[in-house]
């Protein structure tokens, strides 16, 4: 039997499709999401409705974003979910979550078993809409969840860690083995909860500057910041901020990256593009 076929649908590699089929895992994820009637619930990549069905049972209305035309068509004719669903057959990577929140009149509760081949760029896309999002629950590659929650002085702490924690409180929820999926992925998975900060713990004047600094620092993570960020900050400026120029990118806290971003925004602001 072809282990890429589940419920009559052939999993498409180009969409990174792995379908969840373990009932205990499904129940645990739905319990973590805790869907309530009246909430603006949005699922990314519903696939064969493993999460859509138990979440939809608790709701009067559910919005789903599904790129695969065949899967979107299956959902439209779903025997009991069909009437509850608003289906957007499009790419979540270009979806305007801000417009949807405005249309629904409240912040969104976003969830999904995300395709692992786009999970990191999709997270960055979602971070740009955190003003329109109440919370997010995602199944991701375990390695990505480890990066999301990592703190300084860790090998997996990187740009994703800094930007995720700048925008959100990040909480690991559950680890999931490959056997919970059809076809089984070659990696372990995990569920993570991201709750956008109601009040930013480390506000920055221009998030583009924070993005630039973290990109430059972590692209050269083995270098000291005296070297990797030398084109942006003098040793004197770093020392004046209480930041040791001999540290590497992975040694610098989210608060310190935000401090550097604010210095640069004040003293060498980016031009409007």
Swiss-Prot record:
Keywords: Cytoplasm, Methyltransferase, RNA-binding, rRNA processing, S-adenosyl-L-methionine, Transferase. It comes from the Bacteria. InterPro entries: KsgA/Erm, rRNA_Ade_diMease-like_C, rRNA_Ade_Mease_Trfase_CS, rRNA_Ade_methylase_Trfase_N, rRNA_adenine_dimethylase, SAM-dependent_MTases_sf. One of its GO terms (molecular function) is 16S rRNA (adenine(1518)-N(6)/adenine(1519)-N(6))-dimethyltransferase activity. Gene3D superfamilies: Ribosomal RNA adenine dimethylase-like, domain 2, Vaccinia Virus protein VP39. S-adenosyl-L-methionine binds at residues 18, 20, 45, 66, 91, 113. It is found in: Cytoplasm. Pfam families: RrnaAD (PF00398). GO terms for cellular component: cytosol. Its EC number is 2.1.1.182. It catalyses: adenosine(1518)/adenosine(1519) in 16S rRNA + 4 S-adenosyl-L-methionine = N(6)-dimethyladenosine(1518)/N(6)-dimethyladenosine(1519) in 16S rRNA + 4 S-adenosyl-L-homocysteine + 4 H(+). Belongs to the class I-like SAM-binding methyltransferase superfamily. rRNA adenine N(6)-methyltransferase family. RsmA subfamily. Specifically dimethylates two adjacent adenosines (A1518 and A1519) in the loop of a conserved hairpin near the 3'-end of 16S rRNA in the 30S particle. May play a critical role in biogenesis of 30S subunits. This is Ribosomal RNA small subunit methyltransferase A.
